[in-house]
Amino acid sequence: MQKIGAFSKTVVFFSLCLSLLLYSVPASADKIKVVATIAPLADFARQVGGNKVEVTLLLPPGASPHIFEPTPKVVREISQARLFLKIGSGLEFWADRMLHSAPANILIVDSSSGVDLIKGVSHDHDHDHLKNDEQTNPDPHIWLDPLICTQIITKIEAALSRTDPSNALYYKKNAAAYQEKLRELDKEISGRTKLFRTREYVTFHSAWNYFSRRYGLKVAAVIEESPGKEPAPRHVKKIIEILEGLNTRVVFAEPQFSPKIAETIAREAGAKVFFLDPEGGQKGRATYIEMMRYNLAIMEKALR
């Protein structure tokens, strides 16, 4: 109960702060201020917006949107934005309520709108009053499919053009050029994943379903079905049994979460642990394309 109350008070506090900040926001500069929840969206905004936008990333590299708690700085950034880019499908549960108090002229881009979503993924963020909504949300990790990202780019281009009609052609050209790069990336990943000897693997959380669907792979099991919550002993036992039945025993951990439970499971099953990064934003995988190639190289090492 204390967690519920603390979270509710946090939301109310930040909503009040956001409302107060609306009266002190300076006139926007020449560049359009864009706020993005995760690093891939921030990169997309820069690719399409070029020198016409100022992009702010809300989550620091290495943070997980599943367990993120907003700060006053986050409230301030949202209050000053013209565009707010989110994945949607319940990923940014911490932002949805604050956006009700956002400036009237802010344009919210829901990346998952209109996407062929994978159903039935649980995302319990340990807030009891959110459980029913979160557990019925589709899988939000759409950005790990490059072709779905071409749809996201179209949404960002439309939002920028609506906000800044005089530069619509500029945004359209940038979007088209980047979409072509994403299609090339898709072909590259498709060609390289076809050479994998093993096509099943265990992941830390359910981030890789869209990637697997696109490239004919299979997530055999997920360690943390609810991000931030350690799995029950019975679930751990089941994962070990699944791993023991695979030709190549691989567990993919993630830098956003502690690897201890993944390492324990791998040790019991005689498996190897590799690290995939579903969010990027760090050195060597700062851009979306760098991040995807980084993950592809890790997968090749583990599964070929």
Question: Can you annotate each of these PLM segments?
Answer:
Residues 2-14:
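Bacterial N-terminal signal peptides that target proteins for export
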